[in-house]
From Swiss-Prot:
Subcellular location: Nucleus
Name the UniProt record assigns to this protein: Vacuolar protein sorting-associated protein 71
Subunit structure, as described in the record: Belongs to the SWR1 complex at least composed of ACT1, ARP4, RVB1, RVB2, ARP6, YAF9, VPS71, VPS72, SWC3, SWC4, SWC5, SWR1 and HTZ1.
Organism: Saccharomyces cerevisiae (strain ATCC 204508 / S288c)
Residues involved in Zn(2+) 2 binding: 256, 259, 272, 277
Domain of life, per lineage: Eukaryota
Transmembrane segments: none
Zinc finger (HIT-type) boundaries: 244-277
InterPro entries membership: Vps71/ZNHIT1, Znf_HIT
Spans annotated as Disordered: 64-92
Residue stretches of biased makeup (Polar residues): 64-73
Role description: Participates in the catalytic exchange of histone H2A for the H2A variant HZT1, an euchromatin-specific factor, leading to chromatin remodeling and changes in transcription of targeted genes. Indirectly involved in vacuolar protein sorting.
Protein's UniProt keywords contain Oxidoreductase: no
Length: 280
């Protein structure tokens, strides 16, 4: 098994240098060439690339002062040109206003908004009084918090729960209206003649029997009220049920031979013969 661990020599060891690979086979480049005699494979060691952190840091920080023509210095010059053009395009007040607005938008709780100037002062080194005098909070800008919350306006008030941001009443009303507009409309019930007739009966203080006996209702209104009050399913099922003429039961129904009445048991049959049979 090949050893992938390289022994460290304390005399020549540099902790700032990292190697590309510790496997000697992985550091060799193998190529195959095909000619008339056959395939010839050649291998040569790959150049070992060392990354020294100390050299990279020194090159990074000294390239600006020396002004050499390497890639790092050109990148620094390009960045410096962009920064100069950015500073020339905007004033310091506009930059502070933009930073403050970005930090306020990044704040999760509205109660932490007064602490934004202090944090911005610690980051930029500009005094807090100067930040508060030259910039405006997000609630006072035209496209600030009101635009963020969909046009809702906030007012800082003192309530029984303490200081905080409170929505104005008209804003709450706008939110309720917008919520109602998103809800599906309720389906309207059709105003049929049956409902109108029933409402007339319920709104009147007269007795039902006196109302029906009077000549105010015609035959159509009576049919409408009856069909609305009674259960239609019950009348559809009831004629299909055969009951005993004595006890009203509906199990083991049989009929009398003489008169044809329905009987369910022997006792009902005896009682029927004694009292109700017409053809005895």
């Amino acid at each position: 098994m090949k050893a992938l661990v390289e022994e460290i020599d304390k005399k020549t060891y540099n902790p700032d240098i990292y190697f590309t690979s510790l496997d000697p086979q992985a550091r060799r480049y193998t190529s195959k060439k095909i000619n008339k005699q056959g395939t010839i494979s050649t291998s040569r060691p790959v150049k070992r690339i060392n990354y020294s952190l100390a050299d990279l840091e020194a090159r990074l920080y000294t390239s600006r002062s020396e002004g050499d023509g390497n890639s790092i210095s050109r990148q620094d010059d390009r960045n410096s040109k962009n920064s100069h053009s950015f500073e020339e395009r905007y004033t310091q007040q506009e930059i502070l206003q933009s930073d403050r607005r970005f930090m306020e938008l990044n704040t999760e709780n509205f109660s932490d908004l007064p602490n934004v100037p202090t944090l911005l002062s610690d980051l930029t080194g500009v005094p807090r009084d100067r930040i508060e005098s030259t910039t405006k909070p997000i609630s006072q800008t035209s496209d600030g918090l009101s635009a963020l919350m969909g046009g809702s306006s906030f007012v800082k008030e003192h309530s029984k729960y303490g200081h905080g941001w409170v929505l104005k009443p008209e804003t709450l009303r706008e939110i309720q209206l917008s919520y109602k507009s998103t809800k599906l409309p309720k389906p309207k019930r059709k105003n049929t003649n049956r409902i109108v007739a029933l409402k007339k009966v319920l709104s009147s203080k007269r007795n039902l029997h006196s109302f029906l006996d009077s000549a105010l209702l015609n035959l159509m209104d009576k049919n409408v009220i009856y069909h609305n009050v009674y259960n239609k399913r019950y009348f559809k099922v009831l004629p299909l049920i055969t009951t005993c003429s004595i006890c009203g039961g509906y199990d083991s129904i049989s009929s009398c031979v003489n008169c044809g009445n329905k009987i369910c048991s022997v006792s009902c049959f005896k009682l029927h013969n004694e009292t109700r049979c017409r053809n005895r």
